[in-house]
């Protein structure tokens, strides 16, 4: 779809859905190709999978996405596989997610997608993201959009696997490479922390910026990261370009070593997290 302010989806699930399995599917060529930035209020968005628990009383439960290949998705500022809002119990495993222009897999709060939802349940939780291969989730896939229309020449902001205001999710045994960032436990919310998650036994390598990232969406939100564990992961040869430590709209000087993010990055509002036994 080339129209502004539209949101093409490959698969859309909402309401009180439950007991759904997607297995051995291919989802590809879902694209928003409009050349709209945010300067005038227009936007570009698409999803391969969009799961929104938008009922305050009953969550979406028992959702499984496994052995699927998801690729060639132009999401704009949205995500490729999105689990958000009142979702309680899900598994994403043995999938391959690659060659997409922004975030690969996200487990999120419903602040934006389910605005007005009950804050006590408006976040995805009790999930497992396991044994997936996630690669080339990068703004470099669509430099014409990110560098041209979005006017951000140092845009390396896409994350392979991302918990953003979600909770109680295990991320394990995944391989993530050639993404802008590999794994994020971050919050783009002022009211929902990313909390009580476990990142373990993953291999992340050759990513443009940091391998594993915790804390606020720097300079924008204060939800933070709490009660999470980052253990027994292997991180190799990440941080290939400079980071965004100055918080200036991801527009770091990519040649400035002082602006480097490193293999593991902690931003503001990281509380009661444990990082141990990682091989770097």
Regions found by a protein language model. Give the residues of each.
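Extracellular beta-strand/beta-solenoid scaffold signature
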Residues: 3-14, 35-56, 74-84, 101-124, ...
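Leucine-rich repeat
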Residues: 125, 134-139, 164-177, 205
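Outer-membrane beta-barrel pore domains
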Residues: 196, 204, 227-229, 235-240, ...
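Active-site lining segments of carbohydrate-active enzymes
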Residues: 71
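Parallel beta-helix/beta-solenoid
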Residues: 1, 8, 12, 16-17, ...
């Amino acid at each position: 779809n080339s129209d502004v302010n539209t949101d093409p989806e490959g698969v859309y699930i909402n309401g009180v859905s439950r007991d759904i399995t997607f297995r051995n599917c291919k989802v590809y060529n879902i694209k928003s190709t409009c050349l709209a930035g945010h300067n005038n209020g227009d936007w570009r968005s698409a999803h391969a999978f969009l799961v929104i628990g938008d009922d305050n009383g009953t969550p979406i439960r028992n959702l499984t996405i496994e052995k699927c290949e998801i690729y060639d998705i132009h999401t704009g500022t949205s995500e490729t596989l999105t689990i958000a809002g009142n979702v309680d119990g899900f598994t994403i495993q043995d999938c391959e997610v690659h060659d997409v222009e922004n975030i690969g897999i996200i487990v999120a709060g419903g602040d934006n997608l389910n605005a007005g939802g009950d804050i006590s349940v408006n976040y995805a939780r009790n999930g497992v993201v396991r044994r997936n291969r996630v690669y080339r989730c990068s703004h470099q896939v669509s430099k014409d959009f990110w560098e041209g229309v979005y006017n951000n020449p140092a845009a390396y902001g896409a994350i392979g696997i991302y918990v953003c205001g979600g909770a109680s999710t295990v991320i394990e045994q995944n391989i993530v490479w050639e993404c802008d960032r590999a794994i994020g436990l971050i919050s783009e919310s002022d009211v929902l922390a990313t909390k009580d998650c476990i990142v373990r036994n993953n291999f992340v390598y050759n990513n443009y910026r940091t391998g594993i990232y915790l804390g606020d969406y720097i300079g924008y939100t204060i939800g933070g990261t709490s009660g999470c564990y980052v253990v027994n992961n292997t991180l190799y040869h990440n941080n290939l370009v400079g980071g965004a430590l100055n918080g200036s709209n991801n527009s770091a000087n990519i040649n400035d070593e002082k602006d480097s993010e490193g293999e593991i990055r902690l931003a503001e509002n990281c509380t009661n997290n444990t990082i141990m036994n990682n091989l770097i």
